[in-house]
Every structure is written in structure tokens, then in C-alpha cells.
Amino acid sequence: MKMFKSLSQLPRIVSPFQKCYSTDLISLVGIPRVKITKGQNRYLLVNIHTHGFTKYGRVIVRGADVDNHLTVFDSILEELEPQGICAKILGGGRILNEADSKKMKIYGTSRTFGSADHTRTRNILHSWTTYKDFKITVKN
């Protein structure tokens, strides 16, 4: 009888390990942290996570040369929803990407989503190998 009681505890013990090593969570690693274009970009700072696992998220930067931040958000949803990944917008702004001179300027705010943490955005960009050598300035 004691053995059956012990076995009934097994799902509670195994469940946290299943969540940590789930293939859904590993799929977040396959999502590039940065996708921006050259020139003037409207960008969004986004926290992504697998549906139901908000604790195990990842912050990404997405930007494009578009008229408003909602267009950027729509493209993010088109990219992530088929994979079962949810997105929470942390804020937005603008990035001036001068790839030829290896300079970037992060500034401004999104009227729709509010202001992003530009310093955090800069740190994410610096961690990306493409923009590691760029001089990135932040203006609040």
C-alpha cells in the first residue's frame, strides 16, 4: 500500500522536469533574437513564450521600415503563431540602423505599445554577432 502512495507522487515529481526539457521550450531557442532591416526601423521589444509556460520566456527584437508598430506586431504574430508561441509586447520605438558605418541609434516610443527599455534593446543587439561591433547610442 505504501508503494502505491509513493507512486501516486511520481507525476508531481516528474512534471517540473518535463516542463524544463520540453521540445516546445527548446523551440524558443530556434527563434532569432534580432530581426531588423537597414535604415529607419520601427521596432518592438517582445517577450515570447510557449503557450502555458510564461515563466520560461525569451526577449526578442523585431523591426521593419513600416508606417506603424501594428504592422510589425502583425508580422511577429505571423511568424510565431504557427509554432504555438505567444508574444507579449514590452514596448516599442525606433532604430536608425546605419550598417555601412556600423552605427545604430535607438530612440522614441510607440504610440500603440508605449516605450521600450532602449538599454535592454541595446544589450540584446550587442549580444547578437551581427551587431556586436556596432556603436549603439540610446536616446530616451
Curated annotation (Swiss-Prot):
<keyword id="KW-0726">Sexual differentiation</keyword>
<feature type="active site" description="Proton acceptor">
    <location>
        <position position="69"/>
    </location>
</feature>
<protein>
    <recommendedName>
        <fullName>Sex-regulated protein janus-B</fullName>
    </recommendedName>
</protein>
<dbReference type="GO" id="GO:0005829">
    <property type="term" value="C:cytosol"/>
</dbReference>
<comment type="function">
    <text>JanA and janB regulate somatic sex differentiation.</text>
</comment>
<dbReference type="GO" id="GO:0030154">
    <property type="term" value="P:cell differentiation"/>
</dbReference>
<dbReference type="GO" id="GO:0101006">
    <property type="term" value="F:protein histidine phosphatase activity"/>
</dbReference>
<dbReference type="InterPro" id="IPR038596">
    <property type="entry name" value="Janus_sf"/>
</dbReference>
<feature type="binding site">
    <location>
        <position position="42"/>
    </location>
    <ligand>
        <name>substrate</name>
    </ligand>
</feature>
<dbReference type="InterPro" id="IPR007702">
    <property type="entry name" value="Janus"/>
</dbReference>
<feature type="binding site">
    <location>
        <begin position="110"/>
        <end position="112"/>
    </location>
    <ligand>
        <name>substrate</name>
    </ligand>
</feature>
<keyword id="KW-0221">Differentiation</keyword>
<dbReference type="Pfam" id="PF05005">
    <property type="entry name" value="Ocnus"/>
</dbReference>
<dbReference type="GO" id="GO:0007548">
    <property type="term" value="P:sex differentiation"/>
</dbReference>
<comment type="similarity">
    <text>Belongs to the janus family.</text>
</comment>
